[in-house]
Swiss-Prot record:
It comes from the Eukaryota. This is Histone H3-4. GO terms for molecular function: DNA binding; protein heterodimerization activity; structural constituent of chromatin. The nucleosome is a histone octamer containing two molecules each of H2A, H2B, H3 and H4 assembled in one H3-H4 heterotetramer and two H2A-H2B heterodimers. The octamer wraps approximately 147 bp of DNA. Keywords: Chromosome, DNA-binding, Nucleosome core, Nucleus. Pfam families: Histone (PF00125). The gene is H3-4. It comes from Stylonychia lemnae.
């Protein structure tokens, strides 16, 4: 009976040594392989329909550009929302076309 208990204890010690980190008890944070998080984000944003540019910074940009043409312009909130919707749709289409061009040329990275 005593002979059977000793190996179990040795196995338990061996398993404990394997799971314990080698650098004195400080565990490294978990990291995904390169590209995994990017693919997950691509799937997430392709499923979603909400606007991705923050509303207030976009509104400030619209007002700044419009002030170059005419001062003291006022905007309905629905007009700014329509401009933002169109701008984001245009940018998504542009990135889709850019990605197709990069794939065609045998590249992965797109650059401005």
């Amino acid at each position: 009976q005593t002979g059977a208990k000793a190996p179990r204890k040795a196995l338990a010690n061996k398993a404990a040594r394997k799971t314990a980190p080698a650098d004195g008890g400080v565990k490294k944070p978990h990291r995904f392989r390169p590209g995994t998080v990017a693919l997950r984000e691509i799937r997430k944003y392709q499923k979603s329909t909400e606007l991705l540019i923050r509303k207030l910074p976009f509104q400030r940009l619209v007002r700044e550009i419009a002030s170059d043409y005419k001062s003291d312009l006022r905007f309905q909130s629905s007009a700014v929302a329509a401009i933002q919707e169109a701008a984001e749709a245009y940018m998504v289409g542009l990135f889709e076309d850019t990605n197709l061009c990069a794939i065609h040329a045998g590249r992965v990275t797109i650059m401005p």
